[in-house]
Amino acid sequence: MGELTTSIVAAEEGGGTSNFLIPNGTFFVVLLIFLIVLGVIAKWVVPPVSKVLAEREAMLAKTAADNRKSAEQVAAAQADYDKTMADARGEASSIRDEARVAGRQVVDEKRAVASGEVAETVKSADQQLSQQGSAAQSELQSSVDGLSATLASRILGVDVNSGGSR
């Protein structure tokens, strides 16, 4: 209880007439300074900052629009590229097929020419062998009489040429 009394006494000694609910002159001075600073900030600081923020927002909107436009252009270019590549692949495929057909025709033509040449060569060789066989046959038939007479003479020991002419 002694402490409570000393704090009340100390409060009375410090000028007991001041009430914290009633503002004194410093409050109004501080309030006036605050309002002046607030007015200065509102007049000279906020408009340039607002202008910069508005410009930045406009720049961001323009950048976003440019990005969308660029994305559309890229998509269009990609679609055009894909279409061109598909056309080129189709054309290359048709050219390749035409080349295969032409190659097969050339091979077939060369094969036909080669078959004709082989047939001619075989026919020529057959004729040549037939002629050689006929020549050998006539030669052998002409020499058969002489050889048979010689062989008969050797086997019999008698000259057959003179007896065979009768």
UniProtKB/Swiss-Prot annotation:
CDD domains: ATP-synt_Fo_b. It comes from the Bacteria. Pfam families: ATP-synt_B (PF00430). SUPFAM superfamilies: F1F0 ATP synthase subunit B, membrane domain (SSF81573). GO terms for cellular component: plasma membrane; proton-transporting ATP synthase complex. The chain crosses the membrane at residues 27-47. It is a single-pass membrane protein. Its main location: membrane. GO terms for molecular function: proton-transporting ATP synthase activity, rotational mechanism; proton-transporting ATPase activity, rotational mechanism. Keywords: ATP synthesis, Cell membrane, CF(0), Hydrogen ion transport, Ion transport, Membrane, Transmembrane, Transmembrane helix, Transport. Belongs to the ATPase B chain family. PANTHER family: ATP SYNTHASE SUBUNIT B (PTHR33445:SF1), ATP SYNTHASE SUBUNIT B', CHLOROPLASTIC (PTHR33445). F-type ATPases have 2 components, F(1) - the catalytic core - and F(0) - the membrane proton channel. F(1) has five subunits: alpha(3), beta(3), gamma(1), delta(1), epsilon(1). F(0) has three main subunits: a(1), b(2) and c(10-14). The alpha and beta chains form an alternating ring which encloses part of the gamma chain. F(1) is attached to F(0) by a central stalk formed by the gamma and epsilon chains, while a peripheral stalk is formed by the delta and b chains. NCBIfam families: PRK05759.1-3. This is ATP synthase subunit b. The lineage of its organism: Bacteria, Bacillati, Actinomycetota, Actinomycetes, Mycobacteriales.
